[in-house]
């Protein structure tokens, strides 16, 4: 198996067939819904919040609400249903999450999407949660993760998952690779390719995205959707503390397995960093959209499918994608 990561790969252009990049269509379908772009902000507390979720849903973007305010999830689904926007939430695998699924079913609330969100998704607990959701909420599109092997993808698909999320520890505020020695950090793009070849259902690439060009690379190597954390951190709308240093504003960004999320220093596999304030989230989404349209034009097509067919070269080798503790 070839081992490489995002900065090791360059995609090779094809003849352009559009008169303007603006003709290129970045639409993607996941489940029963179409979305403006194949991107989703990470379901982390400093990346997604209720107001951002509402903005994304209203404007045709995919989102996954984080699971760190458990009691707010049923009212959240109810509100999104009332507004006729897509409802997309996260769950863990603890027993109280089973009660949430049962209560949603009891109230006749079927979320459009539920993401089972744990660090090591190739586990019996995730398989049991998939089956529990499919029993009580059979119409819900279930995303399961996170995983890093073809065996895991196949097993979760066979258990009933409608999509799998690939990536163990490649994120900017994740230190799983350093703390445990395991994961896809440093070879996330190769892991995505490996898993996508085995998949029969959509793959969501999660982690290691440092540039907008990495979105196109993820599509090329098999992702239907790309989950992004650090590029969506630090915006005006983002949750988290703001600080000013030497006249420059910064916002905090921390991992879901960090002590800042957990509230205690136990089984820590995440860290906190400060991101320079980026302004409006809307402006970042516009820039991402334009850059992805450019990627499609370089691929020689009119839609995302063109990117999947381009050739590529491996230009160098890397290990940790620039990350340290």
From Swiss-Prot:
Binding positions (NADP(+)): 203-226
Question: What's a GO biological-process term for it?
Answer: purine nucleotide metabolic process
Q: Where is the active site?
A: 174
Keywords, sorted A to Z: NADP, Oxidoreductase
The EC designation for this entry is 1.7.1.7
SMART domains xref list: IMPDH
Q: Which Pfam families match?
A: IMPDH
Q: What GO annotations for molecular function exist for this entry? A: GMP reductase activity
Superkingdom: Bacteria
CDD domains from the xrefs?
Answer: IMPDH
Q: Which InterPro entries match?
A: Aldolase_TIM, GMP_reductase, GuaC_type_2, IMP_DH/GMP_Rdtase_CS, IMP_DH_GMPRt
What top-tier enzyme class does this entry carry? Answer: oxidoreductase
Reactions it catalyzes: IMP + NH4(+) + NADP(+) = GMP + NADPH + 2 H(+)
Q: Which Gene3D superfamilies match?
A: Aldolase class I
Could you give one GO CC term from the UniProt record?
GMP reductase complex
- Keyword Repressor annotated: no
Which family does the similarity line name? Belongs to the IMPDH/GMPR family. GuaC type 2 subfamily.
Q: Known PANTHER family for this protein? A: GMP REDUCTASE
Question: What is known about what this protein does?
Answer: Catalyzes the irreversible NADPH-dependent deamination of GMP to IMP. It functions in the conversion of nucleobase, nucleoside and nucleotide derivatives of G to A nucleotides, and in maintaining the intracellular balance of A and G nucleotides.
Q: What is this protein called?
A: GMP reductase
The organism that produces this protein has a lineage beginning with:
Bacteria, Pseudomonadati, Campylobacterota, Epsilonproteobacteria, Campylobacterales
